[in-house]
């Protein structure tokens, strides 16, 4: 961004996150109907569906924001970067906590699906198009369907560097 005004006017990922933060505040205050209304409008306007009950940290970056789904019991840590078409969804197998817990500094590639009550460790990378169904250790890179560990994260903070290159041994 060249100015502080650009994200406010032009970046729908930023705009959707701000709408989510208002909806989440309403959700915590017991104003669930208003929170759902904001969620619905955000989904219609931006193509991003973030449940107001989800917990999202600070410093989140949604790049090329479209087709993002974040479920009710999902937890997203600080400084996470996600590209378009990311889903943090449930599998239908769990009753209480149905959605994933994403650690700090994680990079979620385009089209990544992280499903169920699992954790993605801090400073990890999920490759584009991967389907993650099991816990991901810290500072690792996972790829594939279903996702498997393919190496180290490659840097100390993949969400900031946006390094998506997987180095094969």
Task: Show the residue positions of the predicted features.
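Terminal amphipathic alpha-helical/low-complexity segments used for targeting or macromolecular assembly
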Residues: 1-43, 156-169
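Structural signal for interior beta-strand "rungs" in well-ordered beta-sheet cores
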Residues: 43-150
